[in-house]
């Protein structure tokens, strides 16, 4: 009888021990990966993993009080992490031991479906700095990890009540061309400035730009841009220019460009924003208009430009058409930017493509015919976003460096959604991406120095 009791007791003890082991969540696998920004260690389990962390010197220990495990070691060779070991600590316990080569920031967090415990060890020093620049204007710098890559971002948030207004300006000074964004921002006393529209090497603006209701650059390709209808109403919308000149003989000419170099069979509209003169050669015909009446005609090229006048400069077939005009002729000009909102906007700057619409990622690179070097790949970026409450976001991210990989357009859109953007548009990026605060460049341009640009966007006093 005593023998039977002893056997039953032993069986009961064995069952209790098995139940205790079964209650411990088994860790199925230890795995690791290395990216530019971090080393990631993952513990896979069929059950949620409880943990308690402790760091002493260069050793991070993660106690797993209810997780059983077999001894495992990650196959890692990294400048930041020396070794990663999963160590059994009795039947119901185990420990994750991470030995570091240098002091690093880290983050530990559980995930579900499937159950995992993730340990991220960062190669770089994560940092956030925030500064109040003016009433309603905040600047935030971040060194962070985004999608497993390092990222440096520079964000200016402008609340609707701020006594500042966003306006375009020429980085070249008074006229069209290329120049130092930082120099112009300092000379104009701007609190904040960023680069904006695309341009060619001669400073030809590729896009539509309007300031104080006056159009100073145009592009026929429909592309997204920022529109300011008044001090309080701002939107992001498609913009596409079309314009005509109606000749007295009934011929209607299509205006193909504004304030840019004249090319073959072209018809370009110039105003005094461009330069003191049209800078054209003698192989064409130019007509100066005031109040839509012809006041001067020239075949010599390089016609002067004065405020209140417009010059039509034609080459080839368009030069031949302009030959029918005489002094005093009435030549009505029409132009539209494709919508009533764009036509009545006081301020307008196009870039492209659209990034965010109704709070969702909506990258329209193909629809807006963006060049492959813009549409593809990871690069420094400049963007503008609008939040539901009217807050304006000016964002620059660095790229092409060890501390910041840059973003794809899709990632840029995701980042802006994360910031709360309801709508957003991309501007010129790469080596052009630049943010200036109080006359000082705060980001790190990827060329290693400031690139001269054409159009900037700055915060002007209302």
Predicted regions and their residues:
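Bacterial N-terminal signal peptides that target proteins for export
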Residues: 1-10
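Repetitive helical segments and hydrophobic/amphipathic motifs
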Residues: 13-14
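N-terminal signal peptide c-region/cleavage motif recognized by signal peptidases
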Residues: 17-19
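Gly/Ser/Thr/Pro-rich low-complexity, intrinsically disordered segments
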Residues: 23-50, 55-61, 74-462
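Sec-exported N-terminal periplasmic low-complexity segments
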Residues: 65-70
